[in-house]
Amino acid sequence: IPSRPVGGPCYLGKLTMLAPKHTDILKVLVNSSRTGIRRKRSTSHLDDTCSDEVQLWGPTARIFASILAPGVAAAQALREIERLACWSVKQANLTTSLLGDLLDDVTSIRHAVLQNRAAIDFLLLAHGHGCEDVAGMCCFNLSDQSESIQKKFQLMKEHVNKIGVDSDLIGSWLRGLFGGIGEWAVHLLKGLLLGLVVILLLVVCLPCLLQMLCGNRRKMINNSISYHTEYKKLQKACGQPESRIV
């Protein structure tokens, strides 16, 4: 609440409810995605130790899990997606390694072919013959696609690196929300969020716990009172014959 609600630098002239349309929200999101700076996320690449054993559920298991335990079905789907990503990364790494070895072999074969052709030309000239004396020796075409292969090879490596694991989801969300903040600010905000979550849990759960404790205490008191009352009744019932005999 400002110190000067009427007049002054903190004057509240008119209060209105903010109720933007769905199209307005989409326009703002599109403009922010176009003009905003892309922040670096805390992702780590999948290593060779990840599990790539994909075991998909059958139709019966999927139906029963979706009806009886949707959370288990969602967790299973996420786990299989992670394993599929690991399998894709390993396959891409093997493919790039294989193509790299094949490229090295092709390069060495090219050098060997050029050396053999130079040796043949030298021997023909040494014996006084030209290329026209042997059919097909005057025209020699050896295509060179090494530059294109290297570019595509590099693109494959870059695509493999696009698959990663977000190791700090909250930190990435805070960096995207507040812009270019430092790591110390991210850790501070994470600590504040954790403290806020703990306080909210205490606020939500503490009344329930207190109510349960009060209910148990009230029940114990009522039980003790009822036991005491029954004891008095039994004592009175046992004391009446004795008084008659006296």
Curated annotation (Swiss-Prot):
The cysteines covalently paired via disulfide bonds are 50-86, 131-138
- Keywords attached to this entry: Cleavage on pair of basic residues, Coiled coil, Disulfide bond, Fusion of virus membrane with host cell membrane, Fusion of virus membrane with host membrane, Glycoprotein, Host cell membrane, Host membrane, Host-virus interaction, Lipoprotein, Membrane, Palmitate, Transmembrane, Transmembrane helix, Viral attachment to host cell, Viral envelope protein, Viral penetration into host cytoplasm, Virion, Virus entry into host cell
Instruction: Respond yes or no to whether keyword Disulfide bond is given for this record.
Output: yes
Q: Which residues form a coiled coil?
A: 75-125, 143-173
Segments in the Cytoplasmic topological domain: 214-246
Residues bearing a lipid moiety (S-palmitoyl cysteine): 205, 208
Residues annotated as site: Cleavage? 41-42
Could you tell me which InterPro entries the record lists for this protein? RSV_p95_env (IPR005166), TLV/ENV_coat_polyprotein (IPR018154)
Q: Tell me which SUPFAM superfamilies the record gives.
A: Virus ectodomain
- Please provide, in alphabetical order, the Gene Ontology terms of the cellular component aspect for this entry: host cell plasma membrane; membrane; viral envelope; virion membrane
Keyword Hydrolase part of the UniProt annotation = no
One Pfam assignment? TLV_coat
Give the UniProt record's GO annotations in the biological process aspect: fusion of virus membrane with host plasma membrane; symbiont entry into host cell; virion attachment to host cell
In this chain, the stretch annotated as Immunosuppression covers 114-130
Topological domain, Extracellular: which ranges? 1-192
Stretches that traverse the bilayer: 193-213
Report the domain of life of the source organism.
Viruses
Residue segments, region Fusion peptide: 58-78
Describe the family membership recorded for this protein in Swiss-Prot or TrEMBL. Answer: Belongs to the Alpharetroviruses envelope glycoprotein family.
What protein does this entry describe? Answer: Envelope glycoprotein gp95
Q: Which organism is it from?
A: Rous sarcoma virus subgroup A (strain Schmidt-Ruppin)
Q: What is the lineage of its organism?
A: Viruses, Riboviria, Pararnavirae, Artverviricota, Revtraviricetes
